[in-house]
Amino acid sequence: MNIKRNKPNILITGTPGTGKTSLAGVIASNNEMNHIDISSAVKEKELHDGWDSEFQCYILDEDKVCDEFEDVMVKGGNVVDHHGCEWFPERWFDLVIVLRTDIKILNDRLEKRNYNQHKITNNLDCEIMQVILDEARNSYKQEIVVELPSTTLEDNENNQNFISQWIQNWYEKNN
């Protein structure tokens, strides 16, 4: 099913601590789009199957999340952020951004969040093994998946500029 939208949908994904939520919020605000923070929505709207005490997070119910956001996503104009990406419907997104962060910086960010050592190690391993990038490449058309560095403030500014320019190009092609 190919649905014509007036605004694009963008997924910003990456290992926890790569700056997804911050970047998604800025992009949504600067481009008059909606920011959908999946992790917050899972908690607030009870889109989960309980609590995972080992990883200290809710166990996301993918079907509940998809049902909750289907109508919103069909309309377009959304910037979604989440550390997982392979379970979203492919039709939802026009651009998939995978943020990557230097391991030392990522470790520092996760420690500041007071993550336990098991959770930090698991997330660092995911970043080293590029798990999220591989999931994105295996789940979406190659031409919509873009890997961006997210280690420095300059990276963040460059990413904002890249995505904003991409949005402008999308409007020119689609409206």
From Swiss-Prot:
Subcellular location: Cytoplasm; Nucleus
CC annotations in GO: cytoplasm; nucleus
EC category: transferase
MF annotations from Gene Ontology: adenylate kinase activity; ATP binding; ATP hydrolysis activity
Job of this protein: Broad-specificity nucleoside monophosphate (NMP) kinase that catalyzes the reversible transfer of the terminal phosphate group between nucleoside triphosphates and monophosphates. Also has ATPase activity. Involved in the late cytoplasmic maturation steps of the 40S ribosomal particles, specifically 18S rRNA maturation. While NMP activity is not required for ribosome maturation, ATPase activity is. Associates transiently with small ribosomal subunit protein uS11. ATP hydrolysis breaks the interaction with uS11.
Family indicated by similarity: Belongs to the adenylate kinase family. AK6 subfamily.
Self-association and partners: Monomer and homodimer. Interacts with small ribosomal subunit protein uS11. Not a structural component of 43S pre-ribosomes, but transiently interacts with them by binding to uS11.
Region of interest: NMPbind: 37-60
Disulfide bridge partners, by residue number: none
EC number: 2.7.4.3
Protein name: Adenylate kinase isoenzyme 6 homolog
tRNA-binding as UniProt keyword: no
SUPFAM superfamilies xrefs: P-loop containing nucleoside triphosphate hydrolases
Keyword flag Magnesium: no
